[in-house]
Amino acid sequence: MFYLNSLDLPVLTGIVVWSVGFQTAEDEAVTWREKQKIVYAAQTPPGTKKDTSLLLPSSYCPEYVESSWYQWWEKEGFFRPEQHRLSHRVDQTFALCIPPPNVTGTLHLGHALTVAVEDALVRRRRMQGYRVLWVPGCDHAGIATQTVVERRLLRDGGKRRQDFTRKQFLREVWKWKNETGEEIYHQLRRLGASLDWSRACFTMDPGFSRAVTEAFVRLSDSGLIYRSEALVNWSCALESAISDIEVDSQELSGQTMLSVPGYKDKVEFGTMLTFAYPLEGHDGEVAVSTTRPETMLGDVAVAVHPDDPRYQAVHGKHCRHPFTNRLLPIITDSVVDMELGTGAVKVTPAHDHTDFLLSQRHALPRLTVIGGDGTMTPPCGQWLEPRNAPIMRLEKDYKHGCKQCRICKCLNEMHCNVLYVCGLSSLLSPCLSRSGDIIEPLLKKQWFVSCEEMAKKAIQVNWLRSLFSTNELSKMYLRLPCSDWCISRQLWWGHQIPAYQVEFPNSTCCSGRTDIYVNTHMHVFIGYTIILSVTDPDVLDTWFSSGLFPFAMLGWPEQTTDLQCFYPSSILETGSDLIFFWVARMVMLGTELTGQLPFKQVLLHSLVRDRHGRKMSKSLGNVIDPLDVIHGVSLERLQEKVKEGNLDPRERLVAMEAQRKDFPKGIPQCGTDALRFALCSHKMQGEDISLSISQVLSCRHFCNKMWQTLKFTLGVLGDNTTPVATLGEVHSLDRWICSRLYSTVAECEQAFETYELHVVTSALYSFWVHSLCDVYMEHVKPVLLQQEEEAVVHADTEHHVRARQVATSILYHCVSMSLALLSPFMPFITEELWQRLQPFGPGAAAQTPLCLQPYPCSSQLVRLQPSHLSFPAVTLFSAIFQKLIHYNTVHCLRFSRLM
């Protein structure tokens, strides 16, 4: 006999209690019991349709359900737009690209959220008859991937990148990319992503590389890309330039010790100190305040505010540098804050962005005293000479951060009156968001993209139709980067810049698609017979190539069929953290290079955090592999994964301890469908998503509820089911469940159009569990299970047959339509159950997949609208029932027929 309370919920007399909310994390260890694993043992060749004629297992098992289906879908080409031959097809397209995951490692739950959301949108449109294209891909992730490979080589073989030639090192990176890329694609398949694998795209594939080169050359030819010496953000650990957007500013309220890559001990930051420069040719001195005393070796001036009465007498005079013996002019500029420190500031144009602008206005020289590796350079001078002491340079191998105390000591010895002020109100310390490396402003020749004109052009074409109504988000969308974008990186892994140093009497740089093109072009232009061109060794910023993804993945710059049919994309769905890194750059580059926006809409989702609300980080031990949730994993295996990673010993201990606390018994097997449904059940916009395994486990229980429902349904269905439209007069509760089905379809329809997937999942869960199982099935169960002999005894055979026919027909259609509604979220279990249900349907559908069946829409169910039905007795019950659902607990009364 079918047991509705299949999850062992407490049964009170005459009442079933069902909790709508997810279980708490504390309940997880109590409620989870290891389930018997059931294996699909049929000898089905890969890519062949699964055999659903086998007996339905007694309980739900993800491993059984999820076997074979994906291989069949993929081999049959159900995910390709060429599949657009459905009877219900419409003349519309729906296209989007998956935000290409970095090949730095495997996917985490944040990626799983992206897949769950995008696949739900894609599968629904495909079922609606749209011609759908969803392209998979991976990003080469220059800085991140090179760093990971360098760590691996150092850990495994004790070798640094500098021990390899560029060609040898790139061979190691490609080896890493191939391993990681395959694993990422395996994860995407296990997540059920209905991607068109025949169009998979990697950002360093030959075709994509041609697109990158073409984009660079076109932008260079139009003057939007140029090479110039400028003050850039420099990572001393990477020895590379970094774009402004990759720099985080951490606020320091005073003296702070920070860990910096390349240093064993923490380095002091946030201490303001004051020292005095002696006036040249006059008695007195000018005291300046700074948090960077080591950069005073590159000072070229002292600046004061023109209206500051304290310094009126020294305008135009000079100070003498105590170490380098240079004369420093005292200049006036309104940018100086009279209230900060002494009101006089040292000017170091080569190591401070504000000072760089001062040097432009006042024609000051720029002296670089810190090298690209973070060490002091020879131009610091023989700065102890004024004391007639032995010559002591700032050794080149001595890191600048450790030099502060030495400089301060010497300043005191030279009577420059050093005063420490530890109570600094606030200071913004720039650091690289990826590694925590302190960013050093350095003067370097780099390649830049001029963004101002592109940003204006994008805004003029109403660059996006915002999906959000809040003013904050609307303003955020319009904050396109207007400062010039540094796109050159001093790395080995990435797209080598298609620019060439051309040697002739006066050397110059020019861009070109190939070196042959450059030599030919320059020969014609200049007239020299022998020209030697040397390729620029730098590579492009990863975000430059990623910004081309929406059209480069379709074959641009060639006018391919895909580009003509599927560009621009229907929607871009991505994490809210990528709006400036990726979204803004795609908008500018797409508008400039293709003349139109790369997508019509943008949908942003929040970040996934752990159940404590913490950002997921490998060093915290809370990064979860989606496959570990799908298959289940022991604590021991989780700990092994941490040991196999690149964490340092201290971080490894922290991560392993966190795992022991959060997953004392490991992670139970939840399955793909449960994970996807749990992720889509969260509101995507607004606050970040705090996900716990217990929430996913609750969704696995829902899968079991679906399984048991179908098991019961298959047990009561006859050979053929009567279509609902031909039933004629039906019972009031039958009409009620039909109206609930219509309302659910209408609610899903509306929520899908506004991308509120949490509303869709909530409506589907509520209908299946509360309306269908807890009310309708409990009501019709006596009719469906009553034997014909009993009906004869009660002389009610005709009435019994009629009631049974109505109940089975309505039950079939409710279950079948619910499976179709749930299919975009739970593709595996819905396919398994739907295929088993179809032989009992009207006319027995052909052997087609559920993912290509028409998606239910309210216009097809207009006869089931409440206004078309009359059920006064049930109306009151429905109102009470829905009110109880609102209070998070449903009390389903076991009642006799309502008339």
Label every PLM stretch briefly:
Residues 2, 14-307, 331, 348-361, ...:
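N-terminal, positively charged nucleic-acid-binding surface of large information/translation enzymes
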Residues 2-91, 133, 689-690, 749-758, ...:
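Basic, alpha-helical terminal appendages of large translation-related enzymes
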Residues 110-122, 129, 138-139, 203, ...:
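Structured ligand/cofactor/substrate-binding pocket environments in proteins
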Residues 143, 148-151, 155-159, 172, ...:
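Long, charged, mostly alpha-helical binding arms that flank functional sites
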Residues 238, 324, 435, 503-505, ...:
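Short Cys/His-rich metal-coordination motifs, predominantly Zn2+-binding knuckles/fingers
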Residues 250, 254-285, 483-488, 495, ...:
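Flexible, glycine/threonine-enriched loop-and-boundary segments that flank and lead into catalytic domains
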Residues 518-524, 889:
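Intrinsically disordered, low-complexity terminal segments enriched in Ser/Thr
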